[in-house]
Design a protein with these regions (language model features):
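Histidine/acidic-residue-rich catalytic or RNA/ligand-binding cores of hydrolases
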Residues: 15-18, 48, 139-146, 166-180, ...
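Histidine-centered catalytic micro-motifs
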Residues: 4-14, 38, 130-133, 196
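Mid-to-C-terminal alpha-helical segments outside catalytic/metal-binding sites
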Residues: 203-244
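Active-site mouth loops of central-metabolism enzymes
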Residues: 7-19, 102-109
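Extended substrate/RNA-proximal surfaces in nucleic-acid metabolism proteins
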Residues: 2, 42-158, 162, 214, ...
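Anion (oxyanion) recognition and catalysis
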Residues: 29, 149-150, 184
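Alpha-helical scaffold segments that flank or form the walls of functional sites
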Residues: 22-36, 56-63
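Short acidic/histidine-rich active-site segments
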Residues: 188-202
Length: 244
């Protein structure tokens, strides 16, 4: 299966990543991507860039090293109402916006509170993707999240880093399977991203591949199927998973 885009990556601007925009673009081109999204951590993440950085992204070319770029932010969900940490004026200037739960920005709450936080972000019309909705420290009710994502044309992410055995997120495999079962039922597209913080991880999907993420109830491994969802968000291939 061709992997044409990876729209959740970070550069040195995020404070805990290790390569420049150009180095990440070259890595994406070398791996055959058509589109690379760079989404720096928004300002409430410790060590990341100031809001002015995002405002000034307009000066950066959208084609580099032979690959198309989308430049945006991984926003932090800040409270159980789903507020995020860039204002509307800046958000409207960005190519894409991912909203995610991070423990340095919001403490885990009850399942109801965590779900409300994600739903608040989904219902923000400027949010395009919910990032890594799989971390077990934030228990979630997936059915209302999938329903709201379908209603608002918001993509849910299958995050390669989440399934890395060396990673810090908990119970990600079972959470993703639960989410993807509902995505199939509701015909809700999901998007596969690397969440790369270093050039060599761009376009990686080894942990989020079929062998790891998707299996039927009797253990049979089923493939991810590429589906073109019109223009949708990126005018590219989005992945929807038949998992039952």
């Amino acid at each position: 299966m061709d992997y044409l885009l990876d729209v959740h990556t970070h550069t040195i601007a995020s404070g805990h990543a290790y390569n420049t925009i150009m180095e990440m673009a070259k890595a994406g081109f070398d791996k055959g991507l058509k589109l690379l999204g760079i989404t720096e951590h928004a300002p409430m993440m410790p060590g990341t860039c100031h809001a002015m950085y995002f405002h000034n992204l307009k000066v950066v070319p959208r084609t580099m090293c032979g690959i198309e770029l989308m430049l945006g932010a991984e926003l932090n969900i800040l409270d159980y109402d789903g507020h995020i940490d860039l204002d509307t004026r800046v958000l409207k200037q960005l190519d894409l916006k991912i909203a995610s739960l991070h423990s340095v920005c919001i403490q885990p709450g009850t399942r109801k509170e965590n779900t409300q936080a994600v739903l608040g972000a989904i219902h923000n019309p400027l949010v395009d993707i919910i990032g890594h909705p799989d971390d077990g420290i934030y228990p979630l009710e997936y059915e209302p999240i999938v329903e709201a994502a379908k209603e608002t044309n918001t993509l849910l992410e299958v995050n390669n880093n989440s399934l890395n055995p060396a990673g810090s997120r908990k119970h990600t495999r079972e959470n993703l399977i639960a989410m993807l079962e509902l995505c199939k039922e509701y015909k809700q597209p999901v998007i596969m991203n690397s969440d790369s913080h270093v050039f060599c991880d761009v376009a990686r999907r080894d942990f989020s591949g079929v062998e790891v993420v998707i299996s039927s109830k009797d253990g049979e491994v089923l493939p991810l199927v590429p589906a073109v969802i019109g223009l949708n968000l990126f005018n590219a291939i989005i992945y929807i998973s038949p998992i039952l």
